[in-house]
C-alpha cells in the first residue's frame, strides 16, 4: 500500500502549484511597494501556516467526503449552513469571472503590439462590451464541453509556474550578468527600506495578501494519500510555506530591482508582469521573446481559468443540490446534463459586474485595480467556512476521528480557528476601502466603496433568497398534490 502513498515533498509541490502565481507578487507589490517583503513574512507566519494545517485536519477527518468545504460544514453543523457554504463557494467566483475577459484582452494586446496600449487606449464602453462578448462566448462554449481546453490550460498553468520561477532567477541575477542593469529602488541593502508604515492605509491592503495565499482547501484529496499523514502532512505544509515565502520575498525584491518602489507606474497591476519580462529580455539580449512567451501562456491560462470557473463551481453547487434549499428551476438540466438555468444565472450576474464600471470607472488601469481589489474582498469569504468548520469540529472533537491533528488541545485549536476566521473577516471589511485618492476623484472613490460593500451583500442575500423560493415551490407542489386527491361521494 505504501507504494501508492505520496510523500510530504510531493504534497508540498502539488499545493504550491495550486495556490501560487506571479500575479500574487505583482498585485501586492503594486499596493505596498518593496515593504511588501515584510508583509509576506508576517502573513505566512500568522495566517498561511495555520490555515494550511487547519485544512489538513479537516481533510483527514472527513476523508470520505466529496463535497469539500460544504461537506465539512454539514458534518459539523447543519444542512442549511452547508448550503450557504456551497453557495458562497460558487458566488465568490462571479467577480473573478468578470475580471478574466479584461485579463485576456491585456495579455493578447501585449502579444500583438508589445505594449499595453491596445486596451488602455480603448474607451471604457468598448472595453466593457468586448469583455462582455468574450465572457458570453465562453459561457456558451462551457455548455458544450471543453476537454481539449482543459489539457491546454493544464500545460499553460505549468508554463506559468516555470515562468514565475524564471522571472525571479533572471531578475536577481541581472545585476551580475547584465552590466547595463541598474537597480530601480534605492537603499535595497538597508533593512529600513522593507519596514511598512502600519497605518490605516496599510491595513486596507491586507485582503490582497489573504487572497494571494488562500485556496489551501484545494489540496483536500491529497491529505489521506500522504504516507503517515500525522507526521508527513504538516512537514509538507511547512515546506509549502517555505516555498511560498521564498518566491514571495524574492519575487518582490525582483520587482523592486526593476521598478522604483517610491515611484510605481499607475498601470503596474495591469501591465507590470509583461513590462518586467520585457525589461529583463532587453537586458539579456532576447528582446521581447520572454514577454511574448509569458503573455501567450498567461493569455491561454486566463482563457482556461475562465472556462473552468464557469463550469466547476456551478456543478459543485447544483449537481447534488438539496431541493429544500435550491429551487427546481435552478437545478433543471437539459437532456445532455447541462445546468441551463444555472448558466443563465451566472451570465446575468457576471454581465452586471462587467458593465457596472461604466457608471463610475474612468480608465482601464482603475478598472483592473478595482476588480482585483473587489476579488480580494469577495473571494476570501469562502475561507470563512473553512475556519467555521474547524471551530465546530473542535467543539465536538470527541465524536470525530482523524489521522492528523493540527492542535490536540481543544481550547487552543478553537482559538486558532477563531483567529483565522476573524483575521479573514477583518481583512475583507478593510479591503472594501478604495485604493485611490479621495481628493483626486471623490465620485470614483464613493462608487468603488459602494460597489465593494454592496457586491458581497447582494450576492449573499441572493443565496438566502433561494431557500425561500424553494420552500414556496414545495408548498405549491404539496398543495397541488392534495387537490388531485379524489374523495369518494
UniProtKB/Swiss-Prot annotation:
One of its GO terms (biological process) is amino acid transport. It is a multi-pass membrane protein. Involved in aspartate and glutamate uptake. Plays no significant role in the excretion of accumulated glutamate. GO terms for molecular function: transmembrane transporter activity. Pfam families: AA_permease_2 (PF13520). It is found in: Cell membrane. It comes from the Bacteria. Belongs to the amino acid-polyamine-organocation (APC) superfamily. Glutamate:GABA antiporter (GGA) (TC 2.A.3.7) family. Disruption phenotype: Disruption of the gene leads to strong reduction of aspartate uptake, but only marginally affects glutamate uptake. The keyword Chloroplast does not apply. Gene3D superfamilies: Amino acid/polyamine transporter I (1.20.1740.10). It comes from Lactococcus lactis subsp. cremoris (strain MG1363). This is Aspartate/glutamate permease AcaP. Keywords: Amino-acid transport, Cell membrane, Membrane, Transmembrane, Transmembrane helix, Transport. The chain crosses the membrane at residues 6-26, 36-56, 91-111, 122-142, 152-172, 195-215, 238-258, 290-310, 342-362, 373-393, 413-433, 449-469. One of its GO terms (cellular component) is plasma membrane. The lineage of its organism: Bacteria, Bacillati, Bacillota, Bacilli, Lactobacillales. The keyword Protein biosynthesis does not apply. Its main location: membrane. InterPro entries: AA/rel_permease1 (IPR002293), APC_superfamily (IPR050367).
Amino acid at each position: 500500500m505504501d507504494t501508492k502513498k505520496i510523500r510530504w515533498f510531493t504534497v508540498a509541490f502539488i499545493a504550491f502549484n495550486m495556490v501560487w502565481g506571479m500575479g500574487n507578487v505583482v498585485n501586492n507589490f503594486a499596493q505596498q511597494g518593496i515593504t511588501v517583503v515584510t508583509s509576506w513574512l508576517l502573513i505566512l507566519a500568522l495566517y498561511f501556516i495555520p490555515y494550511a494545517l487547519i485544512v489538513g485536519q479537516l481533510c483527514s477527518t472527513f476523508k470520505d467526503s466529496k463535497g469539500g468545504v460544504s461537506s465539512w460544514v454539514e458534518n459539523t453543523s447543519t444542512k442549511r449552513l452547508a448550503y450557504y457554504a456551497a453557495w458562497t463557494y460558487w458566488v465568490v467566483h462571479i467577480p473573478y469571472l468578470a475580471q478574466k475577459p479584461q485579463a485576456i484582452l491585456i495579455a493578447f494586446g501585449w502579444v500583438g503590439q508589445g505594449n499595453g496600449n491596445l486596451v488602455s487606449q480603448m474607451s471604457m464602453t468598448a472595453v466593457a462590451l468586448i469583455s462582455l462578448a468574450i465572457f458570453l462566448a465562453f459561457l456558451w462554449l462551457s455548455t458544450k464541453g471543453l476537454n481539449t481546453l482543459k489539457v491546454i490550460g493544464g500545460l499553460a498553468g505549468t508554463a506559468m509556474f516555470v515562468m514565475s520561477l524564471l522571472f525571479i532567477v533572471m531578475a536577481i541575477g541581472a545585476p551580475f550578468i547584465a552590466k547595463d542593469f541598474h537597480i530601480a529602488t534605492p537603499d535595497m541593502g538597508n533593512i529600513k527600506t522593507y519596514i511598512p508604515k502600519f497605518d490605516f492605509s496599510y491595513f486596507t491592503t491586507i485582503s490582497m495578501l489573504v487572497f494571494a495565499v488562500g485556496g489551501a482547501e484545494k489540496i483536500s484529496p491529497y491529505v489521506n494519500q500522504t504516507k503517515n499523514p500525522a507526521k508527513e502532512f504538516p512537514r509538507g505544509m511547512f515546506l509549502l510555506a517555505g516555498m511560498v515565502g521564498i518566491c514571495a520575498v524574492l519575487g518582490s525584491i525582483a520587482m523592486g530591482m526593476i521598478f522604483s518602489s517610491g515611484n510605481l507606474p499607475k498601470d503596474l497591476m495591469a501591465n507590470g508582469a509583461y513590462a518586467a519580462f520585457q525589461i529583463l529580455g532587453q537586458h539579456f539580449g532576447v528582446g521581447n521573446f520572454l514577454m511574448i512567451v509569458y503573455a501567450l501562456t498567461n493569455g491561454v491560462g486566463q482563457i482556461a481559468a475562465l472556462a473552468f470557473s464557469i463550469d466547476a463551481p456551478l456543478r459543485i453547487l447544483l449537481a447534488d443540490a438539496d431541493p429544500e434549499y435550491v429551487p427546481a428551476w435552478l437545478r433543471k438540466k437539459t437532456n445532455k446534463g447541462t445546468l441551463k438555468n444555472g448558466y443563465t444565472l451566472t451570465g446575468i450576474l457576471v454581465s452586471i459586474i462587467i458593465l457596472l464600471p461604466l457608471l463610475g470607472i474612468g480608465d482601464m488601469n482603475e478598472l483592473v485595480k478595482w476588480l482585483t481589489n473587489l476579488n480580494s474582498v469577495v473571494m476570501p469569504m469562502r475561507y470563512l467556512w473553512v475556519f467555521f468548520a474547524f471551530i465546530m469540529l473542535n467543539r465536538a472533537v470527541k465524536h470525530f476521528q482523524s489521522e492528523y491533528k493540527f492542535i490536540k488541545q481543544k481550547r487552543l485549536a478553537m482559538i486558532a480557528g477563531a483567529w483565522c476566521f476573524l483575521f479573514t473577516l477583518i481583512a475583507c471589511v478593510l479591503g472594501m476601502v478604495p485604493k485611490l485618492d479621495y481628493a483626486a476623484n471623490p465620485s470614483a472613490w464613493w462608487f468603488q466603496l459602494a460597489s465593494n460593500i454592496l457586491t458581497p451583500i447582494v450576492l449573499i442575500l441572493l443565496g438566502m433568497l433561494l431557500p425561500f423560493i424553494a420552500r414556496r415551490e414545495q408548498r405549491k407542489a404539496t398543495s397541488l398534490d392534495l387537490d388531485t386527491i379524489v374523495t369518494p361521494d
